[in-house]
């Protein structure tokens, strides 16, 4: 039986790391064999691309070059890790997937959405997560949390307006989406964890 693909999405400071651990523990308790991934990254080549995407280099990275590197990293991960794991009946828990590009590059960078949809269809076809959990947070709150963790990477250093556009696109993508659940990430850690666990429990009941 094919495994399932669950993805966590959200802005910086939304609490994805904590949420990841909550879901991982819940899936393992349910007897699932879980493979953990992150984007960009997850394969040797994809990790090299991650470094180029997230850190300043001697050469300025254009928005479209950034986008293409993200998709190159993504297809490496999907073809070499995610699809084989699902075929073996394993469950995959991902830190970000294609929705990040739709939100960050389509919303934040304001790259043409037709181009994004064309890239998505060309690279991924109809492959998509079985469940996306989006941790929603006001960008000002999230960035304050992120700054508290230390030095910000190239993406995290974008303007507040960039993140408000990104959040708006996330909401457009997740509202009325049967395969997505929106979690209010500004609640207490305990309540966020409880809401996530409920979403996963509901999914486990219907996952076949």
From Swiss-Prot:
Q: Which residues are listed for ATP binding in this entry?
A: 10-17
InterPro entries assigned to the protein according to its UniProt record, in alphabetical order:
P-loop_NTPase, Thymidylate_kin-like_dom, Thymidylate_kin_CS, Thymidylate_kinase
As one GO molecular function, the record gives: dTMP kinase activity
Gene Ontology annotations for the cellular component aspect, listed alphabetically: cytosol
Instruction: Report if keyword ATP-binding is assigned.
Output: yes
User: Which transformation does this protein catalyse, written as a reaction?
Assistant: dTMP + ATP = dTDP + ADP
Query: Which Pfam family is an annotated match for this chain, by its short name?
Result: Thymidylate_kin
- What EC number(s) does this enzyme carry? 2.7.4.9
Q: Name one GO biological process term.
A: dTTP biosynthetic process
Aminoacyl-tRNA synthetase as a keyword of this entry, yes or no, is: no
Q: Taxonomically, which superkingdom?
A: Bacteria
Q: Which keywords annotate this record?
A: ATP-binding, Kinase, Nucleotide biosynthesis, Nucleotide-binding, Transferase
Q: Output the PROSITE patterns linked to this UniProt entry.
A: THYMIDYLATE_KINASE (PS01331)
Function text:
Phosphorylation of dTMP to form dTDP in both de novo and salvage pathways of dTTP synthesis.
Name the family the entry cites: Belongs to the thymidylate kinase family.
* Protein name (Swiss-Prot/TrEMBL): Thymidylate kinase
Q: Which gene specifies this protein's sequence?
A: tmk
């Amino acid at each position: 039986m094919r495994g399932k693909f669950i993805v966590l999405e959200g802005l910086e400071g939304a609490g994805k790391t904590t949420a990841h651990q909550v879901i991982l523990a819940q899936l393992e308790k349910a007897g699932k064999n879980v493979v953990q991934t992150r984007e960009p990254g997850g394969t040797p080549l994809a990790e090299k691309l991650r470094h180029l995407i997230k850190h300043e280099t001697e050469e300025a990275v254009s928005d479209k070059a950034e986008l293409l590197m993200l998709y190159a990293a993504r297809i490496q991960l999907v073809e070499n890790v995610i699809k084989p794991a699902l075929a073996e009946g394993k469950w995959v828990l991902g830190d970000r997937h294609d929705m990040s590009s739709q939100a960050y590059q389509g919303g934040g960078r304001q790259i043409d959405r037709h181009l994004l949809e064309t890239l998505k269809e060309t690279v991924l076809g109809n492959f998509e997560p079985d469940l996306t959990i989006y941790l929603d947070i006001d960008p000002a709150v999230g960035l304050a949390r992120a700054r508290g963790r230390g030095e910000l990477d190239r993406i995290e250093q974008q303007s507040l307006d960039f993140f408000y556009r990104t959040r708006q696109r996330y909401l457009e993508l997740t509202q009325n989406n049967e395969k997505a659940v929106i979690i209010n990430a500004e609640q207490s850690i305990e309540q966020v964890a409880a809401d996530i666990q409920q979403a996963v429990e509901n999914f486990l009941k219907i996952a076949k």
